[in-house]
């Protein structure tokens, strides 16, 4: 594993006292740029799996990510502080930035989905959250076009795939023989 490989170097960033899954994927460069998205920095993540990656120059966003990094570095897992600056404007684009679980990310996703007027498009590796599915189902009933792509190997009795499909939402399984690892939800208001 990657952990086993790193442990042999005995660097201080290898924690032996952790439990659970740390699934963050971000990098802060010089306190003014960030990279973030669904991509794991592995050969498969970069060359075989479908992923997305955002590269953004913003010292305010970098401050948010630096605070999250420091929480993790200090061992504050699952109970950190709320994000410093949840609303950040970069040029003409307004970003909302949250970290889970402390910022209640699912609530923010549901709020945005509820605002959709014409369409919701989503791609997700794993989709088990009933509340987010409920928000999509309600928008579908309001004649908002809802379409999604989900990782085929993650479709199970725990996933929301069958629920959405049975309700008439256009949801498909991906066809990448590796992983469709995208995580994105897009809604349109006109």
PLM-predicted stretches and their roles:
Residues 123-125:
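Glycine-rich anion-binding loop/nest that anchors nucleotide
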Residues 1-115, 135, 141-190:
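HKD-type phospholipase D/PLD-like phosphodiesterase module
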Residues 128-130, 155-156:
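Active-site environment of divalent metal-dependent phosphoester hydrolases
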